[in-house]
Amino acid sequence: MAIQGKRIRASVPKLPPAKGASGYIGTGKGQVLRLITIGESTIAGIGVETHEEGFSGTLARALADQLGKPVVWKVYARSGYTAKRVTEKLIPQIAETDIDLIVIGLGGNDAFHLNPPWRWRRSIRDLIAALRERFPETPIVFTNMPPIKSFPAFTPLIKRVVGSHVELLGRSLDHVTEPMPNVFYYARVITLEDWRGVSAPPADYFSDGVHPSALTYQVWARDVAGYVGRLGVL
């Protein structure tokens, strides 16, 4: 499996992060919603040119439409980061003092490293604790785990092993967040079959065989916005 992993890393293009890591959207008359997104390569917008067409910009737009109020948003993300690295390197960079919603996308890199569930749970607890020191009441929403079993660039073996591991980490994340007040995990497992309604072939869901395309970012972000709306926390 290690040899297959090296071949995949060599074959997948090294794409840059998206540009424009902050923005303002919406024309509603309500109080401005302050949003930050935190995470790994998907939140960093790997696979699209700008964050406006990626996850964070689409999420902000969907929330603005859903709530009828403007949204100001900022991205704190880095490709390749595990939950532990996010806590150590990104959380100290957060400049905002007042935030209404925090959305976090993690799990892919911890799965690729085959980090054991106990280590993942500890990293997630540390991450939440670091955020709670700064934002004690702000809703924290963890997005779905990445659909690794659907990645076209991965071999069947890696899809099976790493894909099963990310699902295990998802169950661990659910276990950690369930008793925590105002902390939520969108546990729905992403499958391409769920998104076939947009009438696109499977390859169109990925920019490089691993990272999402603009289409996937936008479908995913709207789905997460719907989940946030159903939570009723805003």
Each language-model region and where it sits:
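Short, amphipathic alpha-helical "lid/cap" segments that border enzyme active or binding sites
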Residues: A83, T87, R121, R125, ...
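Generic structural signal for well-ordered alpha-helices
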Residues: I124-A129, G170
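Alpha-helical membrane-targeting segments
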Residues: M1-L15, R122, S150-H165
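N-terminal secretory targeting modules
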Residues: M1-I36, D65-L67, A225-L231
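Alpha/beta-hydrolase-fold catalytic nucleophile elbow
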Residues: G105, T143-N144
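Catalytic His-Asp segment of secreted/periplasmic serine-dependent ester chemistry enzymes
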Residues: I148-L234
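Conserved SGNH/GDSL esterase-like catalytic core that processes O-acyl groups on lipids
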Residues: V32-I36, T42-R122
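A short helix->loop->beta-strand "cap" motif at the edges of active sites that frequently abuts
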Residues: F135-P139
